[in-house]
Amino acid sequence: MSKERGLISPSDFAQLQKYMEYSTKKVSDVLKLFEDGEMAEYLQGDAIGYEGFQQFLKIYLEVDSVPSHLSLALFQSFQTSYCSEETVKRDVVCLSDVSCYFSLLEGGRPEDKLEFTFKLYDTDRNGILDSSEVDRIIIQMMRMAEYLDWDVSELRPILQEMMKEIDYDGSGSVSLAEWLRAGATTVPLLVLLGLEMTLKDNGQHMWRPKRFPRPVYCNLCESSIGLGKQGLSCNLCKYTVHDQCAMKALPCEVSTYAKSRKDIGVQTHVWVRGGCESGRCDRCQKKIRIYHSLVGLHCVWCHLEIHDDCLPAMGHECDCGLLRDHILPPSSIYPSVLASGQERKVSKTSQKTTDDLNLSTSEALRIDPVSNTHPLLVFVNPKSGGKQGERVLWKFQYLLNPRQVFNLLKDGPEPGLRFFREVPDYRILVCGGDGTVGWILETIDKANLPFVPPVAVLPLGTGNDLARCLRWGGGYEGQNLGKILKDLEASKVVHMDRWSVEVIPQQTEEKSDPVPFQIINNYFSIGVDASIAHRFHIMREKYPEKFNSRMKNKLWYFEFATSESIFSTCKKLEESLTVEICGKPLDLSNLSLEGIAVLNIPSTHGGSNLWGDTKRPHGDIHGINQALGAMAKVITDPDILKTCVPDLSDKRLEVVGLEGAIEMGQIYTKLKNAGHRLAKCSEITFHTTKTLPMQIDGEPWMQTPCTIKITHRNQMPMLVGPPPRSSNFFGFLC
């Protein structure tokens, strides 16, 4: 077997990661087979030979065979980097080294990956990287940059300067501490060395099957795909082909970031033939005859559509069109190693420390947004709203830079927040339900961001009470996303209150369900309302197919309310519950309640208003509420409560009493206006003496006797949509 030595190439590493994406096996699963299972025969002490290594890869990657060039390159890489002279002579590799490497790739901590790579290049095992070892690192970085299609002609001196900067004490060598410090703050070492591989713009189309309701022509063979027939369309550039033409298609034109200094700051048009859905030229305003052949051009960034003949009249520079306020053009994103030395020095003091290690592709790229714009960070939950989430995901990937759009099912919101961390004046759009919004807000809370961005909501699925209150509607129904983005551009910021919930259980043998959240964004309830929600939740978990529309949900809710009214599980609630508002007891003795709701926003259960409508007093409502709040932390006077309007930024909660399940069902189905207004306050405490149903933001649970304290936590900037346009002339007068 050849003893050619060398590190695994970037392309081989990319192929390895692709295999790992589709495998469900863990390293621990494979090790068991080698230690005491069917693969034990391949063990030679604590090492395995090439044949055993191939078996390891086949089992771990769940494939029938691994390309010989890949398995050989990996095997030789382990021999070069990790093994002693003895193991090299025996033509084996240490199984512990192999398992350690793949464990790190599975999801190891960044600091572990950094330490691992340090030892990989420290070939003489003296604990420092000398000049020859640093040169070896630079060579590997150059290979990686070439694989990523960066302009390598300008890169070598930059990398040499960067490696000098890592030598913080000027000793002429790099210690492990200096290596870890650099990787944790300013230098994307893992990406540059090929251990993080999501940077490649590889020219591959992101195909999705599409059935075309009107004549469309194949970008490759230029013949008709057929009316009502299915073809393939690229999510990123709208390049469209027959299924059988996809293998021969030209590479995707979309490059998501600048790969050379000369490309930074100047965005040019990227024209793709066809895709002119409007049928009208944005240059001459005449029709584009799209029904007869493959004609016209569209720009993937500004989305202008023009005749082929109008191209010479168009300038080279692209301003990103109507959505420029939201878009990060490729010219605004570039490898951080291409930043000047001064910029890197500044970022050393502004970015994270080794105590906050969480490296990813985001550290490899730097964002320098176009001035006077508000780049949009989009989070999409593809599971929300059936298939709506998936459609919204690929639509935004076309309308914006794909690097602005994050699939929450992949890695959650953290990668997106890290990527935008240093961007000024950006906004966030959350595409999902109230639960998804809560997840994003909680992550922002924990992220310790230098700038807390305002958050807008594109509601998917049912419910969506927060989106309703912020004027984004009760659910996305296929509206034009470009128009929604223009509405977002015109939105206003409101600082929404958020509340902490502390549940202190009493000593009891009963076991409580886990509390779903520690923060209230929408509402908290105890009693009949939560009991109905709990039944609804259990049934939906068992039979999700029965809860796939708003109308079905309303009917099911009404049915559960009816059955709850028969059993009255929360009757005489005041006998097992006491309430304190700002330290003062709330008198419930004259009321026959089966539930209490604490509201941060006026909408619950998909649009129900438990507080009810308020006759508008003369003057500014927000000002009146503030005046009332200034007079007293607690408002319980019924006459004053009649004039109080819910305000999600007044640091006050509305407390509502509910008589029973029938009343709750009537409110939910709009047959009754509201419950009983009990109080408006800034702090509330419940003491319970028996197990009761409770819910936070629509997530119910059964709670054993306890004390519950609700206090103000903070405020989060949220974006409120523009007011709805009036549908008649007289509406302008209101």
UniProtKB/Swiss-Prot annotation:
Region called Necessary and sufficient for the diacylglycerol kinase activity, residue ranges: 358-505
This protein's name: Diacylglycerol kinase alpha
GO cellular component, one term: cytosol
Residue sites binding Ca(2+) 2 per the record: 167, 169, 171, 173, 178
Pfam family membership, one: DAG_kinase_N
Consequence the record notes for mutating residue 554 to N: No significant effect on diacylglycerol kinase activity
Annotated phenotype, changing residue 383 to N: No significant effect on diacylglycerol kinase activity
Modification sites for N6-acetyllysine: 483
ZnF endpoints (Phorbol-ester/DAG-type): 204-252, 268-318
Reported regulation of activity: Stimulated by calcium and phosphatidylserine.
Keyword terms, alphabetized: Acetylation, ATP-binding, Calcium, Cytoplasm, Kinase, Lipid metabolism, Metal-binding, Nucleotide-binding, Repeat, Transferase, Zinc, Zinc-finger
